[in-house]
Amino acid sequence: SLSISSFDTMELRYYPNTMDAQNGVNVRAYMGRLLDGLKQYAEDFSPTENESLMLIGNAGLGKTHAALAIAGLVLEQGHDVIYVSSPDFFGKIEATRFDPSGDADTLLRTASTADLLILDDLGTEFVTPYFITVFYSLLNNRLGAGLPTIITTNITDLSLIHI
């Protein structure tokens, strides 16, 4: 939740204080610099000037915590933030796509126009042709409007390219 997920509650001590053999950097120091950059991103947030981000890594590294921390700071500045679990969001859209109430359209319109959209856990949803169409449309609309999106995912290989 936002109340417990802030940059102040991110604990660097949970990251190993060792060198990463593949990248040749100290893991804890690298994560500290990364979190500083994410905090700066949030503090300087502007819906039309910020880039989109993709936070990639194994489960338990703090991607969701960092995304919620960004959301909290951006909300404090008075911007609109939509934070959704990707499988829940796309599942709801798929479940209501034939509903005459227009819930799916409302959800998509809201997500397409928010100052910041955060899609958490992309890649854990059931991938269907409809999902791919909606996902592409959502990102395309946001890119066209110049609005940033933050995506978190546990997928660390190239399988996201197939989505």
Residue ranges and their predicted role:
Residues H79-D80, T113-L116, A145-I150:
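Loop/turn-to-beta-strand initiation segments
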Residues N50-H65:
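Walker A/P-loop nucleotide-binding motif
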Residues L12-E51:
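Pre-Walker A (pre-P-loop) alpha-helix and adjacent loop at the N terminus of AAA/AAA+ ATPase modules
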Residues D80-S112:
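Short glycine-rich substrate-engagement loop in P-loop NTPases that contacts/grips substrate
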Residues G72-I82:
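Post-Walker A helix-loop "phosphate-sensing" segment adjacent to the P-loop in P-loop NTPases
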Residues I161-I163:
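Conserved small/polar residues in nucleotide/adenosyl-binding loops
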Residues S101-L143:
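Conserved nucleotide-sensing/catalytic segment adjacent to the nucleotide-binding pocket
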Residues A66, I70:
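Hydrophobic positions on the alpha1 helix immediately C-terminal to the Walker A/P-loop
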